[in-house]
Amino acid sequence: MRLIPLKSASQVGLWSARYIVDRINGFKPTADRPFVLGLPTGGTPLNTYKRLIELHKAGEVSFEHVATFNMDEYVGLPEDHPESYHSFMHNNFFCHIDIRPENINILNGNAEDLVAECKRYEDKIKSYGKINLFMGGVGNDGHIAFNEPASSLSSRTRVKTLTEDTRIANSRFFGGDMEQVPKLALTVGVGTLMDAEEIMILVTGHGKAQALQAAVEGSVNHMWTISTLQLHPKGMMVCDEPSTMELKVKTVRYFQQLEAANIGRL
């Protein structure tokens, strides 16, 4: 597993955006052979989306032949609700780039049959062959997407009950009122993520330090679903300095030396 230790959250956004642009351009996507990109929501990727929009407007990348799959969506929120992940993605990314609407894939949390919706999503991913690059974030408790602690490490897209910790953390988007935060969500599974050709996880802030430590220095453990990244042949974590505070000094130095050339590209 790769670890890219940077100074700030801003640098994490810039580095990850440039990495995505390089992967898309290197792939040379076409209408018949699109680049398939997995995407998260939340506060952490906002810097990345901002930088991707800037790079797109500067003419450095086109999303015309990029297909996207989002990680998750709340159950029961209307798509046009300001805190739905449909709204988040359109407001913070999709409406600013040249992606084709038919290439955007987000789970439908209002489907009549949620189990069937999850199967449909898995089948749609398989129809593309695989996700080329899945970008994600991590929760304070180490969850990826909505794969909460004790999730199966081979899980597929499914309905999940959100933990109280996750609902408290997300209540900041609902005016601080946890009762407004949905109790259920649809989420890709850990196994779904692991099927991607490459996974890039963004980690920023001291609040994520324990999760980063568990992912990098701990053992693979279903209580820290992020730790599964250790088993991926092309897993990578891009982090800022505050998030590394629980790592051993020698661990950080090791990756600083190992990734010096890549870090220097900023």
UniProtKB/Swiss-Prot annotation:
It comes from the Bacteria. It comes from Aeromonas salmonicida (strain A449). This is Glucosamine-6-phosphate deaminase. Keywords: Allosteric enzyme, Carbohydrate metabolism, Hydrolase. Homohexamer. HAMAP family: GlcN6P_deamin. Belongs to the glucosamine/galactosamine-6-phosphate isomerase family. NagB subfamily. Allosterically activated by N-acetylglucosamine 6-phosphate (GlcNAc6P). Pathway: Amino-sugar metabolism; N-acetylneuraminate degradation; D-fructose 6-phosphate from N-acetylneuraminate: step 5/5. The keyword Manganese does not apply. Its EC number is 3.5.99.6. Catalyzes the reversible isomerization-deamination of glucosamine 6-phosphate (GlcN6P) to form fructose 6-phosphate (Fru6P) and ammonium ion. SUPFAM superfamilies: NagB/RpiA/CoA transferase-like. It catalyses: alpha-D-glucosamine 6-phosphate + H2O = beta-D-fructose 6-phosphate + NH4(+). The active site is at D72 (proton acceptor), D141 (for ring-opening step), H143 (proton acceptor), E148 (for ring-opening step). The record marks S151, R158, K160, T161, Y254 as: Part of the allosteric site. The lineage of its organism: Bacteria, Pseudomonadati, Pseudomonadota, Gammaproteobacteria, Aeromonadales.
